[in-house]
Amino acid sequence: MKIFGYADEGLPVEAVVSAELAEITLVASTDELRRIAKFLESCAEGMEARGRSWEHEHLSDKDRSFEGSAHFVVFNPEWGQRYTGSE
């Protein structure tokens, strides 16, 4: 697993460059943590069901209560990889 992110510096989206992070801290209530866990479980199920065709999902798209929060995105590391027939 890798974690990427960027600081909210008010830059236009085309000027934003993600960086690999060594640590993240979630400042969240117990209810928010449970909703995030549900989102992560849903992402895992989507990846299992759709394989390489499942690209990514935004938490705020699945749970509108996170619309004003920092962007939380899960990305499939196998997305777009060609099937080699050896799997």
Q: Residue ranges of each PLM-predicted region?
A:
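Positively charged, low-complexity terminal tracts
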Residues: 1-87
